[in-house]
């Protein structure tokens, strides 16, 4: 297991951020149970990557954003990844995700961060307000992966989080300290 990764989970209020985390990590969320508004919580999970390595991930479950509320500035520091959540039955929640993506791009200081977008409540087809193809088109343009998920079906949650953990912990292909052939093995700094 490598370093612990910090992932900020954010989106509009009542889109299912906490329910997604509790169902993913513990499998104990009951659909339709009373919602308690989150202030800010931290969940720690161990996720097996596509390389078969278990990685520890700290999920920062943020308060649901409402009009006028922005993501707190501390959510942008030392963050390895983001999970942006909207509800497929709310166009407003999708617009909030679009704004969050712009805010992240502005604040990430050229650091590579992994962003996944989850459209929750995909099982409520008759209440759908966000077009699946339009959302995928937006995600492709933003170079982020988007999955439609349902807390009612835990299996839909697994693939996005394996992708997230795998992408954040990808081994470096090159050394952080490349040595030219000329200097290899000399060990001497003075000339």
From Swiss-Prot:
Subcellular location: Cytoplasm
Main localization category: cytoplasm
GO biological process: inflammatory response; negative regulation of canonical NF-kappaB signal transduction; Ral protein signal transduction; regulation of tumor necrosis factor-mediated signaling pathway; surfactant homeostasis
Binding site for GTP: 11-18, 61-65, 120-123
Record carries keyword Cytoplasm: yes
Region feature Small GTPase-like, mapped onto this chain: 1-191
Domain of life, source organism: Eukaryota
Motif (Effector region): 35-43
GO molecular function: GTP binding; GTPase activating protein binding; GTPase activity
GO CC terms of this entry: cytoplasm
PROSITE patterns assigned: RAB
InterPro entries xref list: KBRS, P-loop_NTPase, Small_GTP-bd, Small_GTPase
Keyword Secreted part of the UniProt annotation: no
Function: Atypical Ras-like protein that acts as a potent regulator of NF-kappa-B activity by preventing the degradation of NF-kappa-B inhibitor beta (NFKBIB) by most signals, explaining why NFKBIB is more resistant to degradation.
This protein's name: NF-kappa-B inhibitor-interacting Ras-like protein 2
Species per Swiss-Prot/TrEMBL record: Gallus gallus
Organism taxonomic ancestry: Eukaryota, Metazoa, Chordata, Craniata, Vertebrata
């Amino acid at each position: 297991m490598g370093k612990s990764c910090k992932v900020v989970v954010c989106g509009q209020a009542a889109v299912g951020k906490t329910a997604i985390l509790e169902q993913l990590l513990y499998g104990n969320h009951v659909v339709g149970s009373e919602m308690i508004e989150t202030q800010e919580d931290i969940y720690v999970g161990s996720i097996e990557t596509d390389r078969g390595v278990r990685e520890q991930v700290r999920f920062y479950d943020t308060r649901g954003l409402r009009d006028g509320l922005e993501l707190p500035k501390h959510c942008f520091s030392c963050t390895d990844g983001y999970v942006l959540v909207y509800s497929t039955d709310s166009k407003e929640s999708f617009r909030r995700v679009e704004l969050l993506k712009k805010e992240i791009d502005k604040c990430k200081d050229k650091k590579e961060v992994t962003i996944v977008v989850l459209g929750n409540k995909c099982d409520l087809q008759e209440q759908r307000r966000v077009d699946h193809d339009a959302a995928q088109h937006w995600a492709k343009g933003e170079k982020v992966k988007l999955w439609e998920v349902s807390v009612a079906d835990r299996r839909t949650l697994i693939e996005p989080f394996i992708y997230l953990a795998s992408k954040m912990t990808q081994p470096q292909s090159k050394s952080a300290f490349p040595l030219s052939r000329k200097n290899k093995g000399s060990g001497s700094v003075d000339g």
